[in-house]
């Protein structure tokens, strides 16, 4: 059991506390000079892998991130939390902005095969695009079973038991390893990296590779036409009677 290896995908996103601003040309959002951090769902995925390692159920944790050189900061955070080594799939900034779930899934699938991992952990979604697709696509490319929105993960021999919340209650899945698991908010509460572990993380290895080295084509078939701010909410109008309300609703075409 202790020979299991886990690959954890971590994404660098604009920090959740930052107010998002759209570029003047509406081609995307402003990222230059903006604070970034690890996607919160990815933090949960890292934490779960580390907890399994602390229970001596996982031997090695590899953190991987796709994007520009700044992604190494995100990988260092994962290393400080307890991951053993990192892989940075270096993608230039302009190309990284158009990176979609399918392109990332192709990279992760190749790395999972190359590293011969037994578990692939991801956050269920990223807070920047909210796609909730990468884990499912990766499982499809690998032809591995998947447990999405995991709120509890238990290793049982050559299987992983995943408990997930659904509309009608809880669903329990048993997946034969290797498998893909995506983390939901209720799975755990990620730890803060301590200063000693942050210092140790600086000495841990981060391997830098190109997507081409993995034989992955990052060409996207999806193009962004325009990114716009949400419309401003218009001021409300007070009405005195029900008749006035009905008349006003008819006036604006609501009824």
Swiss-Prot record:
Transmembrane segments: none
Subcellular location field: Mitochondrion matrix
Binding-site list for AMP: 9, 39-42, 66, 123-134
Residues bearing PTM N6-succinyllysine: 210, 248
GO biological process: amino acid catabolic process; fatty acid beta-oxidation using acyl-CoA dehydrogenase; respiratory electron transport chain
Primary subcellular site in the record, as a coarse category: mitochondrion
Region (Recognition loop): 183-205
Modified residues (N6-acetyllysine): 200, 210, 238, 248
InterPro entries: ET-Flavoprotein_bsu_CS, ETF_a/b_N, ETF_b, ETF_beta_N, Rossmann-like_a/b/a_fold
Source domain of life: Eukaryota
Annotated positions of the Phosphoserine modification: 223, 226
Record PTM N6,N6,N6-trimethyllysine, positions in chain: 200, 203
Any GO CC annotation of this UniProt entry: mitochondrion
PTM summary: Methylated. Trimethylation at Lys-200 and Lys-203 may negatively regulate the activity in electron transfer from acyl-CoA dehydrogenases.
Record PTM N6-methyllysine, positions in chain: 200
Note on domains (UniProt): The recognition loop recognizes a hydrophobic patch at the surface of interacting dehydrogenases and acts as a static anchor at the interface.
Family of this protein: Belongs to the ETF beta-subunit/FixA family.
Subunit text: Heterodimer composed of ETFA and ETFB. Identified in a complex that contains ETFA, ETFB and ETFRF1. Interacts with ACADM.
Protein name according to UniProt: Electron transfer flavoprotein subunit beta
Top-level taxonomy: Eukaryota, Metazoa, Chordata, Craniata, Vertebrata
């Amino acid at each position: 059991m202790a020979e299991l290896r886990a690959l954890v995908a971590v994404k660098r996103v604009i920090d959740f506390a930052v107010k998002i601003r759209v570029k003047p040309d509406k081609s995307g959002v402003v990222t230059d000079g903006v604070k970034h951090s690890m996607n919160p769902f990815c933090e949960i995925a890292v934490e779960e892998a580390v907890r399994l390692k602390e229970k001596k159920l996982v031997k090695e944790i590899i953190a991987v991130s796709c994007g520009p050189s700044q992604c190494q900061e995100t990988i260092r955070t994962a290393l400080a939390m307890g991951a053993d080594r990192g892989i940075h799939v270096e993608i230039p900034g302009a190309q990284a902005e158009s990176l979609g779930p399918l392109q990332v899934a192709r990279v992760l699938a190749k790395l999972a095969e190359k590293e011969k991992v037994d578990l692939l952990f991801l956050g269920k979604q990223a807070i920047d695009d909210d796609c909730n697709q990468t884990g499912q696509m990766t499982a499809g490319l690998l032809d591995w079973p998947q447990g999405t929105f995991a709120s509890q993960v238990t290793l049982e021999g050559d299987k992983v038991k995943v408990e997930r919340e659904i509309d009608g209650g809880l669903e329990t899945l048993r997946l034969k390893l290797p498998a893909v698991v995506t983390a939901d908010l209720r799975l755990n509460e990620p730890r803060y990296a301590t200063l000693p572990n942050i210092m140790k993380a600086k000495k841990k290895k981060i391997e830098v590779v190109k997507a081409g080295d993995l034989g992955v084509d990052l060409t996207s078939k999806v193009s962004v036409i325009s990114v716009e701010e949400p419309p401003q909410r218009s001021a409300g109008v007070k009405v005195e009677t029900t008749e006035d309300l009905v008349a006003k609703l008819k006036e604006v075409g609501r009824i």
